Amino acid sequence: MNINTNKTKEMLLGSIAGNPPSPLSVAGQEVERVTEFKLLGVTITDDLKWEKNTAIICSKAAKRLHFLILLKRSGVASQDLLLYYKTVIRPVMEYACLTWQSSITNGQIDDIDAIQRRALKIINSNSNNQSISVTPLKERRQHQANHFFKLMLSDSNCLHNVLPAVRDKQLTNRLRNPYQRPVPFARTERYKRSFIVNALANYQ
């Protein structure tokens, strides 16, 4: 395997960031150490928080609201405006949401929800028809998380082995769900809000 050091970054996560080791080098060339990095369209920071990624999401979605306004001024029907929102704006706010949906703060949730409220206000303004409403974004994210987690429960799923082993059926045969999986003990709030721990807690 050949590593292109010009395209390779090093990021220190967790407690190691407080006592950083010597810089990583490959073939005598030092790898750049960064505090944030965009991976497959998701901005990850060394504190494992989502302020930067949320800000980018909201900024990108807000820019697309401008075209929604232009379509509204051109007399496009409300149902077509809603279709534009669902296909052009909302996907931006839900991209890779499984990585962050259980970890973002209430303030970040409000920032994302504000974009949807603005879009619906534009769509419904000066409309003679009944106001159009959509499923709350938080509810949609949770639905996606539940669906993905259920896929992971299948033995054939490539992520199945990431989950804790099923509890002994004999010990749980009186429970509503006889195949409960233990929820890992979370010492930190960050780990408690991670996808798998959060999904397991909701599944029990």
Model regions and ranges:
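Alpha-helical interaction elements in eukaryotic regulators
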Residues: 50, 57, 64, 85, ...
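Short, charged alpha-helical motifs in flexible N/C-terminal segments and linkers
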Residues: 1-5, 9-12, 108-171, 195
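Short, conserved catalytic/metal-binding micro-motifs enriched in Asp/Glu and His
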Residues: 39-47, 61, 89, 93-101, ...
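Hydrophobic alpha-helix feature that most strongly marks membrane-spanning transmembrane helices
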Residues: 44, 66, 70-73, 89, ...
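Short, conserved micro-motifs composed of acidic
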Residues: 2-35
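C-terminal accessory extensions/subdomains outside the catalytic/core fold
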Residues: 160-161, 167-186, 190
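Basic, alpha-helical interaction scaffolds
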Residues: 29-99
